[in-house]
UniProtKB/Swiss-Prot annotation:
<keyword id="KW-0665">Pyrimidine biosynthesis</keyword>
<dbReference type="Pfam" id="PF02729">
    <property type="entry name" value="OTCace_N"/>
</dbReference>
<feature type="binding site">
    <location>
        <position position="135"/>
    </location>
    <ligand>
        <name>carbamoyl phosphate</name>
    </ligand>
</feature>
<feature type="binding site">
    <location>
        <position position="55"/>
    </location>
    <ligand>
        <name>carbamoyl phosphate</name>
    </ligand>
</feature>
<feature type="binding site">
    <location>
        <position position="82"/>
    </location>
    <ligand>
        <name>L-aspartate</name>
    </ligand>
</feature>
<dbReference type="InterPro" id="IPR006132">
    <property type="entry name" value="Asp/Orn_carbamoyltranf_P-bd"/>
</dbReference>
<protein>
    <recommendedName>
        <fullName>Aspartate carbamoyltransferase catalytic subunit</fullName>
        <ecNumber>2.1.3.2</ecNumber>
    </recommendedName>
</protein>
<feature type="binding site">
    <location>
        <position position="260"/>
    </location>
    <ligand>
        <name>carbamoyl phosphate</name>
    </ligand>
</feature>
<comment type="function">
    <text>Catalyzes the condensation of carbamoyl phosphate and aspartate to form carbamoyl aspartate and inorganic phosphate, the committed step in the de novo pyrimidine nucleotide biosynthesis pathway.</text>
</comment>
<dbReference type="GO" id="GO:0006207">
    <property type="term" value="P:'de novo' pyrimidine nucleobase biosynthetic process"/>
</dbReference>
<feature type="binding site">
    <location>
        <position position="218"/>
    </location>
    <ligand>
        <name>L-aspartate</name>
    </ligand>
</feature>
<feature type="binding site">
    <location>
        <position position="132"/>
    </location>
    <ligand>
        <name>carbamoyl phosphate</name>
    </ligand>
</feature>
<dbReference type="GO" id="GO:0004070">
    <property type="term" value="F:aspartate carbamoyltransferase activity"/>
</dbReference>
<dbReference type="GO" id="GO:0005829">
    <property type="term" value="C:cytosol"/>
</dbReference>
<comment type="subunit">
    <text>Heterododecamer (2C3:3R2) of six catalytic PyrB chains organized as two trimers (C3), and six regulatory PyrI chains organized as three dimers (R2).</text>
</comment>
<feature type="binding site">
    <location>
        <position position="104"/>
    </location>
    <ligand>
        <name>carbamoyl phosphate</name>
    </ligand>
</feature>
<dbReference type="GO" id="GO:0016597">
    <property type="term" value="F:amino acid binding"/>
</dbReference>
Length: 298
């Protein structure tokens, strides 16, 4: 167990790790990866305590395409609903000797506790507002496919920064490669405690000036308490929603990204092309194949 390497945070990556995973993902994207059944006779358990379309489906498709036996546990009908403690549940699953457990949980940091109770490899598929490392890898992959290098790119992340695990993971990963990170959000949804951030704006038009990449985030109302003041949907779109007119403030070759799910008319208008956003989904599948491959147990 001491030799295993979990994937819980972007901070678990070295620069070499990222390069190797991106190289593998490129091979999977082009269907050129050798030994496509590399996970044959391996078992992957997907344990998702939050709703998911993109991440769950892509992890399941990735594992199956690599030859793994895949178990996606229906949490809503599991023993958790009979009062079983989460630690006991993870120990029970670990006793079945899977090779991977892929976890999404609504509580920030919970994956670090769970990792102490398993002998298999644990992959964080999103924990509360904390981290989403494979989404950050997918976003890095997309950006690097459109831009010559990450260094010195002005990357603007706009939206509900406070509650976003995608923002946290992207900030850390992209800064590792020298990007200039700018945040745009309402004052009540910003987080000022990122040493990696270069600038903060409370106006989208000001923030995206000369931007190379604009990454939009949805309002995560399910994580907000009743005392969290936010603009109405209409006000939010007026101030922080991106449309084709506001996009003119960015560089002419700027790319627009969104990790999904998208709320049209709130953070983005329908007149913005979603080509890159769909590419994030496509590249996300290749990244998850690469991650399962790269971290495969001996």
């Amino acid at each position: 167990m001491s030799n295993r390497k979990d994937l819980l945070s972007v901070l678990d990556f070295t620069v070499n790790d990222v390069g190797n995973i991106i190289e593998l993902a490129g091979q999977y994207l082009e269907n050129k990866a050798a030994n496509g059944r590399i996970l044959e006779n391996k078992t992957v358990i997907n344990l998702f305590f939050e709703d998911s379309t993109r991440t769950l489906t892509s992890f399941e498709m990735a594992a199956k395409s690599l030859g793994a036996n895949v178990v996606t546990l229906p949490v809503k009908s599991s023993s958790i609903n009979k009062g079983e403690d989460l630690t006991d549940m993870i120990k029970t699953l670990n006793a079945m000797n899977p090779d991977y457990i892929v976890v999404r949980q609504k509580s920030s940091g919970i994956v670090n506790m769970l990792a102490k109770h398993v002998s298999c490899l644990l992959i964080n598929a999103g924990d509360g507002s904390s981290e989403h490392p494979t989404q950050a890898l997918a976003d890095y992959f997309v950006i690097s496919s459109h831009k010559k290098q990450i260094k010195n790119l002005k990357i603007v992340i706009c939206g509900d920064i406070l509650h976003s695990r995608v923002a946290r993971s992207n900030i850390r990963l992209l800064k590792m490669f020298g990007a200039k990170i700018c945040l745009v959000a309402p004052p009540t949804l910003i987080c000022k405690h990122f040493p990696e951030v270069d600038s903060i704006y409370y106006s989208l038009i000001e923030g995206i000036k000369d931007a190379d990449v604009i990454m939009l985030l949805r309002l995560q109302k399910e994580r907000m308490n009743s005392g969290c003041f936010i603009p109405s949907n209409r006000e939010y779109f007026y101030l922080y929603g991106l449309d084709s007119q506001k996009l003119l403030c960015a560089k002419s070759n700027a790319i627009v990204m969104h990790p999904g799910p998208i709320n049209r008319g709130i953070e983005i208008s329908s007149d913005i092309t979603d080509h890159i956003i769909l590419q994030q989904v496509e590249f996300g599948l290749a990244i998850r194949k690469a991650v399962l491959h790269y971290y495969r147990p001996c």
